[in-house]
Swiss-Prot record:
This is Putative rRNA methyltransferase YlbH. SUPFAM superfamilies: S-adenosyl-L-methionine-dependent methyltransferases (SSF53335). The keyword S-adenosyl-L-methionine applies. NCBIfam families: 16S rRNA (guanine(966)-N(2))-methyltransferase RsmD. One of its GO terms (biological process) is rRNA methylation. It is an enzyme of class 2 (transferase). Pfam families: Cons_hypoth95.
């Protein structure tokens, strides 16, 4: 695993030890950022099922100024922190060990908005529609923002969730990727 582009291009990322996480492949990550970017002039991101932190770190490398990383797995949190330290990105990040729904509630209380939200839950525990509903209800997505929902290709996600509209859907092997933006 590596950073594909931007200020940290080519740098290696550690993967989470064991089989509890499924990192986004470099090919899928590159495709995702070609769909949403590829580069950014500032903005805040939320990597909600961070794993090794690959998606949020890629966003930072490509111009996001800050990213919040959330995962409930202790080994994943340690790996994110290690990758951020190695890449000298710790001052641009906050890392929390938390459940996804609790993390969304906490961010909503702080009235935190995001330019980019990355949702890549374990394929066996996908509650993407419920998470998209919370993001919409809490109005967490900025006007020009996007949500990347990575999922098992067999999962059918809704075209709309409240004011969120799926603008693109792609499949890469066993992985599906859906991009949502605000209606408007």
């Amino acid at each position: 695993m590596r950073v594909i582009s931007g200020s940290k291009k080519g740098r290696s990322l550690k993967a989470v030890a064991g089989t509890s996480t499924r990192p986004t492949t470099d090919k899928v990550k590159e495709s995702i950022f070609n769909m949403i970017g590829p580069y950014f002039d500032g903005g805040r991101g939320l990597d909600l099922f961070a794993g090794s932190g690959g998606l949020g770190i890629e966003a930072l490398s490509r111009g996001f100024e800050h990213c919040i990383f959330v995962d409930r797995d202790f080994k994943a949190i340690q790996t994110v922190k290690s990758n951020l330290k190695t890449l000298e990105l710790t001052k641009h990040a906050q890392v929390y060990r938390n459940d996804a729904e609790r993390a969304l509630h906490a961010a909503a209380k702080r009235e935190t908005g995001f330019r980019g939200i990355f949702l890549d839950p374990p394929y066996k525990e996908q509650k993407l529609k419920a998470l998209l509903t919370l993001i919409d209800e809490y109005q967490m997505l900025e006007e020009d923002g996007f949500i990347v929902a990575e999922h098992d290709r067999e999962v059918e996600l809704p075209e709309t969730v409240g004011d969120l509209v799926m603008t693109r859907k792609e499949t890469y092997g066993l992985t599906g990727v859906a991009i949502y933006k605000k209606r408007g």
